[in-house]
Amino acid sequence: MDIDKDEIIRLCEEYGGEWGINHTRRILHLITLIAGGKQYDIEAVWLAAHLHDWGGYPKWAKPGVDHAVRSAEVAEGFLSERGCPKATIDLILECIRSHHTGDPARSLEAILLSDADGLDFLGTVGVLRDFSKAPLDLRGGYNAAKKRREVIPKLLCLEESKDLAAARLMEMDELLTAFERGTFGYF
């Protein structure tokens, strides 16, 4: 297997900011917090965390194709070209395809990625990520944050993730309430 991690990091950095390498770094940090002493394939999770959103990057995105589906397509080609073993590719693709579905019938690696990705959309960081997607549309950012606040906690699988989410949800509620108050509802 000839995987150049520096190349992967560079490609994530090329996309940039909160949707590229910084999001990936937060996910990997969250995985260390929620994994506890659980045994999992660290290498596969590292690769999946870096590749899971590539299908949403302008370089690889396809209009009308879900970013997780497209990310799996891109990752499969990328990993195959570099001699990654089929079993490892299959595990990484499972992680990527299911990283935002909440499907409980998955490997621990897929659950770790899904939970960490969800947690990164909660709390202050999550709200700011939603608002950054629509800087000229406050209502759009607000509605996206409110929807994630309702949906994501139901998708979390691990107790460690649910514990982390509790504090992030309180933070999110405080921020959204302050936003409502500060805008007088005019947004």
Residue positions per predicted region:
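Short alpha-helical hairpin
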Residues: 1-10, 48
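Divalent metal-dependent phosphate-bond-processing catalytic cores, especially two-metal-ion Mg2+/Mn2+ enzymes
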Residues: 2, 13-40, 51, 101-187
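Short amphipathic alpha-helical interaction patches enriched in hydrophobic/aromatic residues
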Residues: 12-16, 35, 54-62, 79, ...
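An active-site-proximal "capping" alpha-helix that borders the catalytic cofactor pocket
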Residues: 27, 66-81
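Short glycine-/small-residue-rich flexible loop motifs, especially phosphate/cofactor-binding loops
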Residues: 32, 76, 93
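Short, flexible active-site-proximal loops enriched in glycine and acidic residues
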Residues: 40-41, 83-91
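His-Asp-centered metal-binding catalytic motifs of divalent-metal-dependent phosphohydrolases/nucleases
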Residues: 42-61, 67, 71, 91-101
